[in-house]
Amino acid sequence: MTEELVTLDTAKMLREKGFNEYCRFVIGEDRVISDIISTWNLPPNSFPVPTQSIANKWLRETKNLHIEIYRSACGYGYAIVKANNGTWMKDDDAKGPNDGGNWDTYEEALEEGLQEALKLI
């Protein structure tokens, strides 16, 4: 069992929205993931790449957005709500890639939810 890292697209969006936390890894435009010691002097075109869990926590604590992952007979989906009061913001509208409009794994649904939450900022 391993922690999932966010994708390059999500890492780029996180940086655009102000994510500046230390991450053990960076990802380049070539999609190669490398270990780093410091976020100072990152290689050109490299982006800090957190785990999905850290990205989710950052959104919750700094942007007041909580991503709820739910399970149905068709797979996994997500809803985005305000972290402080549960006010609905957006959900997946059954737009997932499988036949039931969901995602086959929890991690796929969370990745999509992360990207959609970042678009709301």
Report residues per predicted region.
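Catalytic phosphate/metal-binding cores of nucleic-acid and nucleotide-processing enzymes, i.e., regions
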Residues: 1-8, 25, 105-106, 110
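N-terminal segment of the canonical double-stranded RNA-binding domain
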Residues: 12, 16, 20, 25, ...
